Each structure stands twice: as C-alpha cells, then as structure tokens.
Amino acid sequence: MSDNIDSKICTVYTTDGHFQMTYQTIKENDFFKNIFEIVDSICVRMNSVEFEYVAQYLRKEIPKDILINFAYVVKNFGIDFENIVYFNIGGKIFSFEKDFVTKKFKYFERFIVNYPGLGPDYTSILIDKSYNKFQQVLDFVKNQKCPINNDLEIELEYYGWIPNKNIKEFIDVSHFNFIHEGYESFVNHLDQPKYVVSKHSVINDGDKNIYQANIHTMGHVIIVVCLKNNIKKVDLLSKIHVCFQKENEKVPGEENYRSLTNYYLLRKNKHQIIIREALSSQYGDFITYNFNMKISKDLEIDSIKFYCINNGNIRDYYDIPNKKIIEYGKDESIDKINIKLHDLIFSVENSKFSCNYLLNRGINKKIVMDYIFKKDGYVIDYLLFEIPTEIEVSHIELKSRDEIICVSKLEEITLVPPLNRYPNTGSRKIVPVLSNRPTKLYRINKLYNKKLNVNFLLSHEMFCEIVIVLKEPSSGWLKLKYQYMNYY
C-alpha cells in the first residue's frame, strides 16, 4: 500500500503552468503531505519560474537557502527561515536576511527600530516606492557592476545605502585623456584605440620566430607582449628586433630591423613588455603597415596585442598650477562633497594668472588668448587633495553626465621637488599647500596606471563631477591642488 501511495502523481498548478511530482517527493513536507493525502492537485500563487525552485528543493536538488527570495510565499508551505524579515514595497513583498538589510540600508534599520512590535512581518505597512527601481537597487548592491545613473543614485540615497568598506575600484578609460610619463604630449580620449589587433602570423626563422601583423593606423602604436617566462630587461634588448614597413613593400632584410632600445621599450614588468612605436616620424599618413618582430625562440610568447593611436591629437602642453579651498557642511554635517570640474577652471577676473602674467611667463600669445577665450582646451593634471587628518575619506567617485566612470580610493603621496625647467616633461611641478593644521596629501589612485606608466587626465569636455564620499558625516574644509595642461 505504501509503494502505491509513494508513486501517486501530485499536480501543482501555478499562475502560468503546472508541475507534477510523486507523493514520495513531497511527503517529508507536512503542508504538501496533508493536502495530497486528500486531493490530487492544488493551486499556488507563484509563477512557474518561482515554483521551479520549490520543486527542486522538494526533490533535494538545491539547498533551502535558494528559496529566501520567495520566503514570504513558501512559509505558507511550512518552509521556514530564521532571521528573515518581510517588507511591502510598492505592492510587492521582498524577503531579506535581517542582518543584510540593516547593514546595507539605513532606511530599513530605522524602519525596524520604529516598528518593534511588527517584526518579522512588516508587510502591513506599505512603502510607497517603485518595486522595479528597488529591484535595481538590490541588483546594484549585490554585484555593483552596473553603472550608477541619476535615477539609481536617487533611490540609493532614499534607502540610505551603506557602501562596503572594501570598495570595488574601477575606471572606464574610454572617457579619459591620458599621458605617458616622460613624454611631452598627451593623447585625447577621442583618438584612443578603437580596435585592438591580436591576430598575427608566425614564421620560423632559424633560432628566431618572426611575428607578423597588418596594422592600419596613422601614428603611435602601443605593443603589449605577454611572456610565459620571465627574463631580465638587460637580456631582453638583444632578443627582440622590430621592423615597420608600408604595406606591399619588399620583404625586410636584416638591415631593416632595429633592436629594442630603451627608447622604444616603455616598460618591462615581470611577464609583460610595453613597447611604443612612433610611426608618424617616418610616414605621417593614415595607411596600413606591415609589422615584423623577430623574437628569440627562448622567449615563450603568450600573446601580442597592438593598440593603435591616431597621432592627430597627440598634443604638447604647458602646465599652469592652481589651488582651491572647499568648505562644506556649513549648515549640517554631510557625508558627500560634490565638486564640479567646471568650477575648478579659474576665470581671469579672480586669478593671478591674467593675460599679462601668462605672457610674462613666456607663454606664446596665441596660447594665452586661447586660454582667455576658450577654456575647453584644458585638462587637469595631478589633482591632489590636502585633507585634515581627522577627516576620513571612504573613496572618490568621478561622474560624467550623471554616469559614474571611476570609483577609486585615495592614495597618500609624498611630493617630489620640482624640476627647474618649463614646460614640464614628465615630472610635474607640485608645490605643497601650507596649513596650520595637520594634513595629508592624496591623489586618486585609479588615475595612475603603474603597469602601463600612464596617467589619466580630467578634461573640461567630460562635464565631470568629483564626489568625495566620507566615512562619517562631518563639516570643515579641504584644499585641492591641481595643474592645468593647456594643449595646442
């Protein structure tokens, strides 16, 4: 008799379909056992996607924790969870672990304190907000991969999102200009590589391999060679020889190859070689080149990639230093300080850098007039924060047109004595800001890529906003020390 009832088919109708299980599968759950001893089918207020998880749990295919998102419904099935709270947001019931919701959102922490007699089921009080937008908030808080737009930021502020102490740093480099340290030029972000060439052929040439690729570019090429083994830089220069030629030119001979001198080698990491090739010095037109690289066979190559940069907007520059005092929280303590990049671009009327002052410094008259009448020809280089030691900063957010393009921690730095030359070539002239309070000097960590030896720059055209997120609400002041780079 027991075998017969164990094989009984039990049907569960959802709002958009149905499931069938045997009595043997559901009999350990008292709710379903008591029902299916009497009837053969029931209806539940769940859709098929949601009930699929319940069926898998009853079949012992997944753990109970997977059902937490549906805890409010499945508790009617006798599937209980400890430390779970329920909220009604815009007509949809959300289930959370109490520790999660109180540690991530100040709103729910206060909600639970204000209604101690209702817990754990707070659904009798409607939170009159969009449940779709709240779902977006949850998705962001759980993975923090999607960009923060203006609507999402409003929702995060409403619910009092408490960011992780371990901030996930990132930078979207497509928005930034950049400069290679040691060079007198920077690259406009509009002319950064639109493609990466990774496909190449390999020809056996005795004790060397010749790597060949076609590259369509006008000027500068950054070549990244990843090695499987490590080698000292001094030994590397004799093992790699490079040759760039126009398409359809004759096969290069030994005399056409150049050794990898320190001029072309930008950087050598443990297993990575960064090479810069300035094609514009030879040809200066926008065509296809044949790239040939002879590499000794005792160098095991993992991959080679070519980053092609249009040379049309490689710009020379002059540095112009400036500073600004930011006072915040005059009326009440705040935990975010918002600074628009536009406000850092000083005007002639309130700056010592007047037309005559700039001309007296030896700056070209055309450059001075471009500055006075057209300030969008500026990027900001080496933005530094002088912050009193009692103020703790969680992280920095950089926004462009309401989209977060960088999240970064601050890095404490030590100033380098300025070079007695003008314009600067690589090393920047940075003068410490004097203060009668103990302060420390910081820079935005993600704006400096140590591997590629690249500095990312903030430009006027980004419509950038700098958001300083404090660990605790406070009021006071800080100073910004920064330099303009006027390009021409």
UniProtKB/Swiss-Prot annotation:
Domain BTB: residue ranges: 83-150
Domain of life: Viruses
SUPFAM superfamilies membership: POZ domain
Sequence similarity: Belongs to the mimivirus BTB/WD family.
Protein name, UniProt field: Putative BTB/POZ domain-containing protein L674
Lineage, opening ranks: Viruses, Varidnaviria, Bamfordvirae, Nucleocytoviricota, Megaviricetes
